[in-house]
Amino acid sequence: MCIRDRNYRPSLWKSIGGLKKAQEVNREIAKYVDVMIGNEEDFTASLGFEVKGADHNLSMIETDAFKAMIETAVKAYPNFKVAATTLRRVITATKNDWSAILWHDGKFFESRKYPELEILDRVGGGDSFASGLQFGFLEFNDAQKAVEYGAAHGALASTTPGDTSMATCKEVEKTFGGGSARVQR
């Protein structure tokens, strides 16, 4: 099983060919990926897919645009068994709407929505989403649970400092079950 969390960083590609080289390399790698994770920028910059109607200021979430992008990606790469992304609408630097979607076996699964999530530190939210998603699949082999674990874990990580989540499984389950997305200490 090959899992790829697409994080495109222009500064890392600048001296070795820029965007064109990044797309060339990432398109080759994508042929071997089973689970592709990434946001709109990651899919567009790394693989060259366009998200029609996407708001590059992240002031609104266009779920249908992300679904169309993922459908395009899985057609181009039929080896993808799962494609997933977080959905973030930036309200302020410290307040975001947060959720996630996942494609698996031709169907979409959406997480609970976390409106006006209080952000302490955005760093690590995507990685925590990816780890929660993997846990949900490994533990339950259930796409809906996977996207819920991922979104809740990412939300919790965003409410704490640093890029390493200290949330427990119980806290993640409480969060996607309707509890607050704040780590209780």
Segments predicted by a language model, with ranges:
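Conserved small/polar residues in nucleotide/adenosyl-binding loops
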Residues: 1-3
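Active-site beta-loop-alpha junctions enriched in small/polar residues
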Residues: 7-11, 41, 88
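A short beta-strand/loop micro-motif in the catalytic core of glycosyltransferases
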Residues: 33-39
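Conserved phosphate-binding/catalytic region of the ribokinase-like
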Residues: 49-185
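Residues that scaffold the ATP/ADP-binding catalytic core of kinase and kinase-like folds
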Residues: 12, 46, 175
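A short, active-site helix/loop in glycosyltransferases that binds the activated sugar's phosphate group
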Residues: 39-49
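Charged helix-capping and loop-helix junction motifs
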Residues: 17-25
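Structural alpha-helical scaffold elements that stabilize or flank donor/cofactor-binding regions
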Residues: 28-29, 76
